Every structure is written in C-alpha cells, then in structure tokens.
C-alpha cells in the first residue's frame, strides 16, 4: 500500500522552478527570433499593398483619360471658366491635387481608402471620410465636393487625404507632354512622397517623416509609378529608370550623378536641365500641390519659370 502511495505522489509531481525558467527562456529566445521576421513580413505586405494602390490610382486616371482624348484628368478642364459644362477655357486656378483627387473620388474612379498608404506615418494624413456626393451639381458649376469641412484636402501642414505625391498640374511643358496617356515607361507620374525639395543630405533629409514610410529609418524607400502604369520600388530619389536631363552643365545636380554628360533626375525636385533659356518643368517631379501657382483662371500653356516652392507641402 505504501509503495502505491509513493508511486502516485511521483506521478503527480509538477515542473520545478528551474524547469519553468528553462521553458520561459526557450520561449523568449523563439520570440526574439520570430518577431523581427514577422515585422519584416508585415512591412513587406504594406509595401506590396501600397504598390497596388499607386497602380489603382493611376489606372483610374487612365480610365478617365479615355473620355478626354487621352488627357489625364485635369480639374480645370472638368470645371472650366464659365458655367457651361464641358465648354470654356481651362480654369488654371482649379489645378491642384486636392481638386484632382476630389474630382476623381466624386466621379467614382477611385475610393477614399486607396488614397492613403497602409504604411502612412504622418498623423495629418487620413482618409477623406466626410466627402459629400450631394454637393456635386454640374448644373450649378460644382463638379466635386468643395466643402471646407467635407471636401478632399491635400495640405500636409493642416490635413491631407492622400499619402501620394503627384506630378504638378501647372501649365508647363511637362503637363503638355506627359499629363496624358503616353505609356512613357521612363516618366514618373505618381508615388510615395519624398524629402523636402528632393534633399539627399542635411536636416531636410535626415528629419523627414518620409524616411519612415517604407524600409528602414535612415534612408528613403518608396514605390514610384510611371506613365505606362508600371510600379518600381527603390531606395533613391534618382531612379535609374527615369530619363536623365539633357546635359550636366546647368542641371544643378550632384556631380557624382553625371553619367556620360547626362544629369540624373531627382524626382522630388524641379531640376533645370539644359533647356533653351534655362527653362524648368520638363523633368519628372512628384509633390503634393496644395494650390495652383496661377492667380488668374487662364494662364500660358508653357509657364516654364514655375518652381513650385510656394505651392507645395512636405512631410
């Protein structure tokens, strides 16, 4: 009987403190190995989803272009000078990114959710949840929700309903040649935003929130969409795929980015290039443009002195 009792006591014996500590140490070790891998997998998933959203936005523009002889959507062509729908001069004052995305949202070419990156880190960038479709009344010369509290916003200093930078919409050579369905695989049209004025050194680079969107925290990473609707992921504001400027002499670009007399293009900066008279606005540029550079409704079709510095918000 005594032997049976001792046997039962041995069978009911639990883990010792040492054994529990060993198990906990093993679990901690496994978590230490798995968590970085899980974090990397989640970051990769966000980057891929972000890439898909950039592609969808541009596809929406291309679909809209089918109704406009191949011209990508331009707010000033949707809401023209005068009150007759579809007629009149282009209203250049309307041409900013808030109106661009607001008009596409109002016409159903995009939805509010895909306008904000899944990797967004700026608290001022949020989906437009208040857009009022009932405000759209073409008969009253209203083509998107213009409401101060409900309409689509694109101002990183106050509130932006989009994460993505886009080609400026001002009347320049750039717009004349590329704001249409060109299928140009070397012209950047849309993508993740970058450091202020294309900075690659100094505080404007190292302190930029855009370094935190993808990849690590020390260098810029992002998805860039081209006018043929292909997307590339890279770690430089000088993508090799982007067509370089004509010559290096008047480009203002870093000397180490001059290759065979061609200056590589910074997609977050309005590079000069060697155009006649030192004109700008022929290269790929991606910004978030809060207002038009025009103070009047009509403007020249080749406003190539435009710099954009007063009409763009950063971070």
What does each of the following model-derived ranges do?
Residues 50-315:
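Short, well-structured segments within or immediately adjacent to enzyme catalytic domains
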Residues 12-46:
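N-terminal single-pass transmembrane signal-anchor helix
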């Amino acid at each position: 009987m005594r032997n049976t009792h001792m046997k039962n006591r041995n069978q009911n014996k639990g883990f010792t403190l040492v054994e529990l500590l060993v198990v906990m140490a093993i679990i901690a070790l496994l978590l230490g190995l798995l968590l970085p891998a899980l974090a990397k997998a989640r970051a990769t998933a966000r980057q891929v989803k972000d890439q898909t959203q950039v592609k969808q936005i541009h596809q929406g523009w291309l679909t809209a272009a089918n109704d406009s002889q191949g011209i990508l959507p331009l707010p000033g062509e949707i809401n023209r000078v005068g009150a007759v729908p579809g007629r009149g001069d282009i209203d250049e004052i309307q041409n900013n990114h808030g109106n661009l995305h607001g008009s596409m949202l109002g016409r159903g070419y995009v939805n509010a959710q895909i306008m904000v990156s899944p990797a967004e880190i700026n608290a001022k960038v949020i989906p437009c949840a208040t857009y009022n479709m009932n405000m759209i009344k073409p008969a009253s010369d209203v083509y998107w929700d213009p409401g101060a509290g409900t309409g689509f916003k694109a101002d990183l200093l106050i509130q932006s309903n989009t994460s993505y930078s886009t080609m400026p919409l001002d009347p320049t050579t750039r717009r004349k040649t590329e704001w249409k369905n060109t299928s140009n695989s070397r012209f950047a049209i849309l993508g993740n935003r970058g450091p202020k004025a294309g900075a690659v050194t100094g505080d404007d680079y190292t302190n930029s929130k855009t370094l935190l969107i993808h990849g690590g925290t020390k260098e810029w990473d992002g998805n860039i969409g081209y006018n043929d609707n292909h997307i590339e992921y890279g770690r430089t504001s000088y993508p090799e795929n982007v067509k370089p400027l004509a010559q290096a002499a008047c480009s203002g670009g870093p000397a180490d980015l001059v290759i065979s007399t061609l200056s590589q293009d910074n997609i977050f900066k309005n590079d000069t290039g060697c155009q006649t008279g030192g004109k700008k606005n022929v290269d790929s540029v991606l910004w978030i443009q809060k207002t038009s550079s025009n103070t009047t409704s009509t403007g020249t079709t080749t406003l190539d002195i435009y710099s954009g510095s007063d009409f763009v918000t950063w971070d």
